[in-house]
């Protein structure tokens, strides 16, 4: 049986490519205004989703969820970039209310944090760094790789049955779809 992360990767390959095309920094972050629009869309996606994910007992999977939250980093970027934070629509609940599905959601968010390192390097060419509007893409800083590996170990140790892995893949697909919708809004 393929591992959890092999299944997550193969099961979301199409969605992953679509997201990469949507947020390609070389095409989409050519100006400060384009970057600001992306930061605002990211906040509209992350805050409600993280609020839904916060309801789960992550300790069952050996994960401390609180330090993995990113919406507060985006809020700091919004302030640094002088972007007004408009009201948000009420958070839509996850399609399925189980930790396996939520782990699939986290796979997308943690993978985005890992990929943020590439975007962070590009933002430097616009003069944007963690201190002036690029904190979100800075992720966990020097600990980003370590946090990804810790997440992989925890998720793999928790999602061991075929049903659990299937739920995680469904959660990841759902999250990619939500993210695509928010980037196109």
What are these regions (language model features)?
Residues 1-185:
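Metal- and O2-centered redox machinery and metal/ROS homeostasis
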